Amino acid sequence: QFYTDNKSFQLVFDRITTKWLADDTDPDGVEGWSRFKARVEQALRLITAEIDKNSRVIIFSSGGVISTALHLATGMSPYNAIRTGWRLVNTSITKFGYGRSGLVLHTFNSYPHLEYCQSGELITYR
């Protein structure tokens, strides 16, 4: 039987994510967690190396990258950061600061620009 409801999807997605985070290999056609995390860290290093302390940078990205940055900034476990990222609203705003202590989370999953619609129809996920 083929399940297409959100609850079934989430169950499968959780199992796959758990395996992805635990397995340090790169399965055929899939970038492993360690490599993905290293790529996100490298991108953040490149960006922060190019700016001065008064700069503002806007990055448009996916939930996976935002969740990985959340993990890096807070020390939250990769699993909990990814799970937290599952609640990211499409077009939400997450703000990080960068200084001597590294990456710091300022705002997570803010979406005041979508809350004007009373029905909530603009608030979507994934």
Description of each model-found segment:
Residues 2-4, 34, 49, 53-56, ...:
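Acidic, low-complexity terminal tails and accessory targeting/binding regions
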Residues 1-39:
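Phosphate-handling substructures
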Residues 59-64:
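Short, well-ordered beta-to-alpha junction loops that form the rim of enzyme active sites
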Residues 41-49:
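Generic structural signal for well-ordered alpha-helical scaffold segments
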